[in-house]
């Protein structure tokens, strides 16, 4: 018989740098999960993606065991990295903070495709372009 799921916890943590401090500790501690063990597992699986924010979906079972699935980094983080900026524009309609090429947008869309609500690359590219526009990052040819 399958284990009974008690909770599904979603967190966005920096790759390779999960610690028992908030937000990890309180989120997992109240469910009785071994926090240190989760941090070690997460850090081991994300060590190669250092510097990126990696969302994780943790499924906690009745016997206090857990499994977790790593998601792709947020599009805004990937766009900011590609454009070489720290954060998006405070006023994206008037101020552009950087730009990315169509090829970079396509690569980001390819990376994000498993987590987006589309199966087509063309639709994923349009989603990423919309995110770039809302961040004040221009898309050039």
UniProtKB/Swiss-Prot annotation:
Entry annotated with the keyword Nuclease: no
Main location: plastid
SUPFAM superfamilies: Ribosomal L11/L12e N-terminal domain, Ribosomal protein L11, C-terminal domain
HAMAP family: Ribosomal_uL11 (MF_00736)
Gene this chain is encoded by: rpl11
Role this protein plays: Forms part of the ribosomal stalk which helps the ribosome interact with GTP-bound translation factors.
This protein's name: Large ribosomal subunit protein uL11c
Localization in the cell: Plastid, Chloroplast
Protein species of origin: Guillardia theta (Cryptophyte)
GO BP annotation list: translation
